[in-house]
Each structure stands twice: as C-alpha cells, then as structure tokens.
Amino acid sequence: MKGSRWFIVFIVAFLFIMFAIEYHLPKNFVWKPTFGHHDEQPFGCAVFDSVLSSSLPQGYTFSRKSLYQLEQEDTTQRRGILVISDNLRLSDVDVNALLKMAERGDKIMLVSTLFGRYLEDTLQFRSYYSYFSPMALKKYATSFMKKDSLHWIGDSTVYPRQTFYFYLQLCSSYFWGDSLPERVLAQRVFESNEFRYETEVDSLTTDSLVYMPVAMSRRWGKGEVILVSTPLIFTNYGMLDGKNATYIFRLLSQMGKLPIVRTEGYMKETAPVSYTHLRAHETKANL
C-alpha cells in the first residue's frame, strides 16, 4: 500500500510538472489579420501600437472613430491620421471627410489592399488586390524561398535608397504603374515573366524588370493623402521582423512632425455606426 501511495504521488507530481511546462510553452500563433489594438498575435497591432506610442516624439494615440467623426472634431491642431485594414472600402462620406481634413492640412495615411472605387476615381489610381492565405505564407516561409524586395525611392535627401525584404504574402498587393500619384515612395520589383503570370496581363514591356508602386502620396490642399498597399507589414510581425521596422518608420515619417492618431474605426467588430445611419436616426427623431 505504501508503495502504491508513493506511485500515485509520483504520477500526480509528474502530471503537475508537465502541465506547468506546457502552460509556459509558446502558444501556437494565429495568422489571421486583425490589426487589433489588443491583439498580440503576429497580425495584430498590440506591439506595433506600443512601440510607436513610445517612439514617436510628436505623439501617437489610438481611436475608434470614423473618418467622418474625426473630421467633425473641433480642433485647430493638425494631425496625421492612420487607418490600417485589409479591406478599406471607403464610402463617399468617408472619402469626402478625409479630403476635407487633408484640405485643412492634415496628413491621412491609408494602409490597405483595397480602397474602394470612389477613392480610386477621386485620386485617380488603381490597385491590384491579392488574397492573403496563412497556409501559403507558412509554406513559403518553411521552404526557405527567397524573399521579395521592396525598394525605398522616396526623397533621397532625407533617406538614402534602400531595399527591404519581405515574404511575398506580405507585399503581394500594389498599385498599377499607370496610376497618377504625385510621388512614389516605395515600389516592388518583378521579373517581367513573373508580372505577366501574376496579373494575367499581356505586358508589352521588353524590360526584364517591372516596377510597381506599393506606397505613394498625393498632395491635397494644405495636406496630403498617403496610400500604402501592404497592411500586413503594419503589424506586430512587421515591427519585429528584423530591420524592416525601418521601412515602417520611413513611411510614418511622411506625416512630418504631426501627432498621429490611428483609428480602428474600420475593423468589422469595432466599426462605428455609419454617417447615413446616424442621419437617418436624427431624421426620425425630428419627425
């Protein structure tokens, strides 16, 4: 009986130790893009926001307001507005609000793979969307395939030209080269055969390389609208991916010395009531 009791004690102790070890082991990563302020997974923004709030001397704050709500705020201080999403289909109300803010001198940075036709028509650009697959990213990373390159070509008097390397799935969306931006900040480089295969377009180019913008800006009034097609880089993963945080800071530096407000108002679970719904409610209340 005494031996059995010690055996039971040993088993219980062993199970307790194994439970403690498993509890402290790193949890499996979830590669779903959320861009959430409290999400510590690779494609959340908990670390991203924390680093920026402690690194940007001009200030970095977080909001859940829509562009319309931000535009309606009574403030004389100019700001940088940052919106990160994988599907930013802005309505005409959103677009008009952001253009009003830019007109006054604010700088608006929109980071997404999709922007909506109204904004594209207004600013005269077109984007190429590529679907993100976590399984494809995992397969690409574990096969040790060569990373794709993004070339910084912004103002060389401020930053030297530099090449940054990312997995293909993080930078597979871009803007068409015949878009009419005022200034290209960064571009992705394709081999011409790869470009024809990916876009299914019969390119007439005879060059061996094709350059497509992934970040560009356009002045609007006293301010600026900055478009970036690689939202997965603006995450915890992108911030912690070796030296690639430099790429993020270069893009954010386009807002100059303005304090930056990142709004989470266009995430599905936190999206505010739309302007049209607000107006409809107000109309009913006044009847």
Label every model-predicted segment.
Residues 276-285:
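Conserved small/polar residues in nucleotide/adenosyl-binding loops
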